[in-house]
Regions:
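Charged, gly/pro-rich active-site loop segments
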Residues: 1-13, 80, 84-159
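Short, conserved active-site entrance elements at the starts or edges of catalytic domains
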Residues: 4-34, 159
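Proline-centered flexible-loop/turn and helix-kink motifs
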Residues: 12, 69-71
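Structural motif corresponding to alpha-helix initiation and N-cap regions
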Residues: 15, 60-61
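Short beta-strand segments
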Residues: 25-59, 65-67, 75-79, 86
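Short beta-strand segments in beta-sandwich/barrel cores
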Residues: 28, 53, 73, 100, ...
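A generic "binding-loop/recognition-motif" signal
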Residues: 59-60, 132
């Protein structure tokens, strides 16, 4: 597992593109593993702070219970954002896989809450999203181009 900063050190362009997507909407889709082993997908507000990825989860929500029981997650950014007009949409996507780690440090919680783009309640639990694999997809001249990262590897490939 790696922090977002460690991914940035290995694949800075992937992280820059990913942060543009995450900051364009501040929302992404978080997939967790239900108790029966099935997938569950939720929209969440993502916060990038100090080169780390965080999410606050409300008390009592299924996604919070899922991550406390099984920390594996997948995160998918919204797939496109406008560059002024409909004709200039950017067809980019960010997908992350990893483990969510609960953060109980009060200083970290306060620092993330200060820059979080939504209301944070006392019972909300902060998780850091550690990364096992990352992928950014864009299009160049109509061709999908993927940049992938995993610990010890990186590659740029057209598909």
């Amino acid at each position: 597992m790696a922090t977002w900063a460690e991914v940035a050190a290995a694949e800075p362009e992937l992280v820059r593109a990913g942060e543009r997507l995450l900051q364009a909407f501040t929302l992404a889709f978080l997939a967790t593993v239900r108790a029966d082993g099935g997938p569950r997908v939720h929209p969440v507000t993502i916060t990038v702070h100090d080169r780390r990825l965080y999410v606050f989860l409300v008390h009592g929500t299924p996604k919070r219970r899922d991550l406390l029981r099984d920390p594996r997650y997948a995160l998918h950014s919204f797939p496109s954002f406008p560059r002024g007009t409909v004709e200039s949409y950017v067809d980019d996507e960010l997908v992350l896989f990893g483990w969510a780690r609960p953060i109980e440090n009060a200083e970290t919680r306060a620092a993330v809450a200060a820059v979080h783009n939504d209301t944070v309640h006392e019972r909300d639990l902060l998780f850091e999203l550690e990364v096992d694999r990352a992928q950014h997809k864009t299009r160049r001249d109509g061709t999908a181009v993927y940049t992938r990262w995993a610990p010890g590897t990186s590659r740029d490939a057209a598909t």
